[in-house]
Structures are given as structure tokens and as C-alpha cells.
Amino acid sequence: MRFERTNTVLCTCLLLSLVSVGWGQAGGPERLITGASEVSPLANPTRSRLEFDSSDARLVEGFNRAKRQAMAYVFDKDPVGPWYEAAEPGREAFCMRDVAHQAMGAHALGLARYNLNMLRRFAENVSDAKDWCSFWEIDRFNRPAPVDYANDSLFWYNLPANFDILDACYRMYLWSGDLSYVNDPVFLNFYNRTVTDYVERWGLSVDEIMTRPRLLNVRGIPGHKKFQSARGIPGYDEGNHEYAVGSDLLATEYAAFLAYARIQETRGNADAARTFRAKAEEIRTLVNTKWWNDEGHYFYLRVGKDHSLEGHDSGNLLYWNVVDDSPRLKSAVADAGSRRIEVLYRYGDPDAARERLLDIMTPGRSRMEYPEVPFSTVGAVVNGTMGINLVAPSALLSGVEGGWVETSVRTLPALGTHIDWAELRNLPIRANEVTLRHEGNRKTVFTNQSGPALVWYAEFPGSHQNLTVNGKPVPARVETLPLGRAVSSVRVTVGAGGTVTVSAPE
């Protein structure tokens, strides 16, 4: 999951509840707390079948609150087509960054066709006149949101957006199996323009990015107060107006190049896939060498206006998985991990992740009324707590590997020491709907409720010679995850309507 995904994902959004100041009739200040109301389950006719249960009552309560809030933001009868809110509350709109970071939670809630429509709206609106940008934010009337767009010369745009959306499109292809993502000419044009023309127009190639000016392609009225300095912000940080490149720009570009390569593999374009895997590796090498401060043992945060590297924060790089598994990774996790739920789950600290997750679920402690928070919370439970992720080997291997399947399910329980059991029901995965139950970190039960047979990799922490599958010992495969963590797994086929139980030795 991506917590949402910000360099921020669960980070930028997990803000404290907004407190605003109004004025009473007598002219004195009156404190108004926004987002304090409970959302009724009947607030929106769209229903989600996703259910979560656990020995951890606080986690269940928080999940259900997030689910209700997220589903209250779902709409189906506006000119833009099926959509959910993914912007500041009250905008009646969805922006590129937030959609990319909410998409996983939305898919889990059963909103695959909403994701497809919204992502396609962004894809269809890239244009030469906007220097291959799309509309940063689209409202329910299928217009560029007026608050962010005046015309093709004057508009708000954060440059990681194209990359973030491309990566989200590939992820949603994996989870939904919808071939529109890899065959629709509208999507293909967006992908192609993003990794070529967009990169060239905005000076984002590896050879240029470290020396690019902060602003390029300045158009419109000189000195325009709002849009002139915001048409091509080189990161998601909107508070600093001096930097030339944010680490999130490189991190999202890396993710986009990899996603593009995988899409080309799916389409059988081996040469293009190899080219963009190599481009992704060039970015990864740049980050792990030039952006690393060897003396201070940290990654830099940005390129400043004088083109020197400055600041430090590894969160962006860890979120998009750019950091090599080396001593740098341990330092990076220590530097930024405690602030990012997904990073805590990914690198093996489920107890800390749970505490952070419970904190943002607590009413009055987080901006639950901000759409990214509830959607990302749902995604965090799916990908983090339950450890459910999809694996997609290269499609180019399909002709040489006898056991190749396009997509398989991989689970690694992350209940930690405070959760005895947890169960997620009715999770959509491509043409299937599944239920997964973890009993501690040593036993998992997988039910293929509907759809064709699935390949499931059941993983458990530690090095084990055998795992038990439906009561019978089966040789396990032992792998080493980043930071030297051993996991043992077995590959199991779960037929339609079937249930398989896998357990590890105590």
C-alpha cells in the first residue's frame, strides 16, 4: 500500500484536526472544530463489501470509521463520471497527488471503476499546450478546478504528479486486471508522453535534473501572483519556494520508469522495457550515490536554488523504494521510518506501525475529514497490517518459465505483539474476492471466495525448513528481505471456493 503515498502519503495527510476561528454575534472569537461529526453508514448509497475484524477492538473501530468516511466521499451521477473526493474538503474535486495515494484504499473498498475513470480523466487531459501536464485537479463537472487553473498558461502543477499517476495506473492494473490500463490509447499516450516529452520539457532527465532551474516553461502574465511560480513546482513541498528538485520528484520518476517498463513487458515490447528499466536504475544510482551524505549518514531532501544538496529526510525515498539494501537503508529507516506507517510495516516494525495507525484513527487527532486520511487508512490495513500484496513477474518470462503466472498474491502477517488475530473479508483482487485471516504471525487462512484459481505465496517471519499446508509439511523457501530479515514461504494454488491453511513452527 501506499499511504498514500506522500512523501507524505500517510504523512502529509495525517495532520491534526483543523481548528478554525469564527466570530459570534457579539464579535468575540468562537472556536469551531471542523470534521467532528460522525458519518452515517447511510450517507451514500454506494456500498463496500470490505470487512475487517480483529482481537484489537480499537483497530476495528478505527477501520470502520475510516471506511464510513471514505464511502461518504463516493459519487456516481455527476458529469465527470464515477468519482470520489480526493482534494481539500468542499472542493468537490479530485487532484492527481491524492488520487494516486488513495487508489489502493479505494480499490480495496470496491471502487475499481472509480479509479479507472478518474485516472483516465487525468490521462486524457495531457497536452502540448500545457507542456504535457494534465489538469492538477478536476471537479465533478469534469472541468479543471477553477482554484488551480485559469488557462493553459496559468495553472497550478506539482511535477511529481505525472509520475505518481503513471505508477498508480500500473498498480491499479495489477489489482483490477482491467486491460484498459495497458491497451487504451488514452492511457498509452499519457504514459508515452510522460516518460519522453514531459521529461524533456521539464528538464528531468538524469543528465539535466541536478542543474535545472526551479521554474521552466514560464508562460502568461509576468509576475502573476498565484500561478506563475506554481506552474511546475519541482516537488510536493509547496511551502518552500526556493528549491530546484525535491527528492520526491526523483523518487516518483523512478517509480514511473519502472511502471512504464512493466507495462511495456505486458505489451510484449522487450526493448522499451529494457530501456526504461535502465533509466530507472540510473535514477536509483544517482540517489544512492550523489544524494547520500556519507559523513552525516543521511539522504538529502532537495537541491537548493544554488544547486547544492540540502536538508535531510529519507521518507520520500523509502516510500517509493529507491534506497538500496545497504548500510544506508538502516540509517534511512532510522531517519524517517517512525513518521511513516508504510515504512514501519515494510521494514519490520509492526508494533510501531500499529501505534501510529491507531493514533491517526483517533477522533480529534487526525484530519479524518480530509479524504486522503480514511482512504489511506484502509490501504494501510490491507497492505500493512494484513501484509497483502501482489507479485507480478515479467511478462517476458512467460515463454520460458513453466510456473509463470501474471499475478500472484503474497501475504506476510504484520500483527506484531499486540494483535492476536485479524481477518479481512471480501477483498477484491482482479477477478476474485478473497478472505484472509492471520492467527498471530504463525498461521494464515486464505479463502478464495469467488473467481478462478489463485496462486498464493504464504510467507512467515523467520527461517523454517518446512511450513505446514492443510496439516502436511511442505518444504519452505527461505529468502532474505531488506535489513537482513529472513522470511519463509510456500507457493499454494487456491481453487475457486477453496480454503487453504498454512502455518509456521512456533
Model-derived segments and spans:
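Boundary at the C-terminal end of the N-terminal hydrophobic targeting segment
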Residues: G22-A26
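Low-complexity, Ser/Thr/Pro/Gly-enriched N-terminal "stalk/linker" regions
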Residues: G27-F94, N117, L286-V287, W291-D294
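Active-site core of glycosidic bond-cleaving carbohydrate-active enzymes
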Residues: G62-N64, E92-S127, P185, N189, ...
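The feature captures the catalytic groove of carbohydrate-active enzymes
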Residues: G81, E85-R91, S134-D164, R171, ...
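Non-catalytic C-terminal accessory modules of carbohydrate-active enzymes
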Residues: G348-E506
